[in-house]
Amino acid sequence: MPIQVLPPQLANQIAAGEVVERPASVVKELVENSLDAGATRIDIDIERGGAKLIRIRDNGCGIKKDELALALARHATSKIASLDDLEAIISLGFRGEALASISSVSRLTLTSRTAEQQEAWQAYAEGRDMDVTVKPAAHPVGTTLEVLDLFYNTPARRKFLRTEKTEFSHIDEIIRRIALARFDVTINLSHNGKIVRQYRAVPEGGQKERRLGAICGTAFLEQALAIEWQHGDLTLRGWVADPNHTTPALAEIQYCYVNGRMMRDRLINHAIRQACEDKLGADQQPAFVLYLEIDPHQVDVNVHPAKHEVRFHQSRLVHDFIYQGVLSVLQQQLETPLPLDDEPQPAPRAIPENRVAAGRNHFAEPAAREPVAPRYSPAPASGSRPAAPWPNAQPGYQKQQGEVYRQLLQTPAPMQKPKAPEPQEPALAANSQSFGRVLTIVHSDCALLERDGNISLLSLPVAERWLRQAQLTPGEAPVCAQPLLIPLRLKVSGEEKSALEKAQSALAELGIDFQSDAQHVTIRAVPLPLRQQNLQILIPELIGYLAKQSVFEPGNIAQWIARNLMSEHAQWSMAQAITLLADVERLCPQLVKTPPGGLLQSVDLHPAIKALKDE
């Protein structure tokens, strides 16, 4: 088949495979467009879970008649015009793909009017070349988008839609997330002609807790601790639930936003989990609604098709900033209980500090926490204290890093506590849920960790190997098999074929599926950790290993595979190390409590400190 340019409709349908996963994806893209247009009211009508109808109506700025046809074209946008705009993006959308992709897999109609126009205009695309037709219409200032019969022309995609109830639940969750991001916008959601959600706008300076309670429930509101934390151009606001009263139902509330964009970021989740670890059990998760504001130049949002992930240029700084912000609020909560009465609480006495000697954290002190009212009230919550001015954070992150390391090198002051033997294993407490905080990368593959003033070195390749083994070891259900686009066919000896047949059930539990004939074996599926490996080298080595075995246990095979996998990282970065440890702590909590040999090595600084003092 010769190389040729794809027809516009087919190209858009391919793009829709990334952008339009289900009806909720359509709702997300269209509502974000409404927010970018400055809408203060958005009405969303859904029929049959979004499969039959999705209608989004807003009172935004509207689209000019001359731009309606462009609005349905690929890579046409008003959000950016240059690379500089992309590197400092503040709008929710910017690629100009959503409307073109949605219109290629549905019957989409766009009706809009600007304040300068006397009449509205309607546009829709049809045909193989996606030609746009524009005609007059009746409509107030703003925009309405109707998406009919989603996936009507792609039956393979349509059959993967779930039940009406399931698809609407995904839409409901998307609207919850958006409503938490924009308190200043009224959002109404209806399903099959019935109003399901009404989120009224909160006026500037009003009580955001009212909408927070409507979305997250009064149980979260009663346990919520308000956060207000700032350092340089980083700001963290929001609420985190008291970990001492977190329930499984509350743990489902985990909403995080970066510059108003809803995110699912493992680095942020790890920082929050680490701050709460001392108060959470092994099977508990923190509950939070947090808003991170950062210089747009310091974050890359163009890393995921649906913009669910971001990449921070200074991931360590962001991680430590969030960790310290959440930790400080939890510590304040221990010192000052949440006031439930109407009497103002006296402000705590200011204690003089010596920052250089004490080696305090390099982030600015937070404003005083405003406790969240346990029930709805038209008056502001009582007991709050005026925010203290932010200390000047301009000397720079690099300069203040020295204070952190000085803190780690300091000999701890004696504590007035009952006599207890000094710990022989410095790194981790028995009930710890975290390896600690990553300070830096040493020799490209080791992470220097700090926990409770103790320093240790962690081998990242060994941690990665244990993580791969956990991912490969079957639990109650077999490991999920990932079909290969091109099956791998290998020639085997009679002995190797016999070993494979004996190990077939064990390999199936590991997600490895194969077929054999007289002299060949065809690998048809492998587990996810093997997808990025060189299977033409790994699989023959695995077959050779199996040929030497007499007993085929899935755990032993998983251990062998994990030891022989090639690492994806020749040079580890801070972000990669933090992500790896977050996964290890989640999937292999036993490694935190009892680290195996070769994984963790404590670093004793006392001889170095003594040598310095003896000079």
Curated annotation (Swiss-Prot):
GO molecular function, one term: ATP hydrolysis activity
Ranges of Low complexity composition bias in the record: 364-387
This protein's UniProt keywords: DNA damage, DNA repair
UniProt cross-references to Gene3D superfamilies, sorted A to Z: 3.30.230.10, Histidine kinase-like ATPase, C-terminal domain, MutL, C-terminal domain, dimerisation subdomain, MutL, C-terminal domain, regulatory subdomain
InterPro entries named in the record: DNA_mismatch_repair_CS, DNA_mismatch_repair_MutL, DNA_mismatch_S5_2-like, HATPase_C_sf, MutL/Mlh/PMS, MutL/Mlh/Pms-like, MutL_C, MutL_C_dimsub
Cellular component, GO, one term: mismatch repair complex
Residue ranges of coiled coil: none
Biological process according to GO: mismatch repair
Protein name as it appears in the record: DNA mismatch repair protein MutL
Gene: mutL
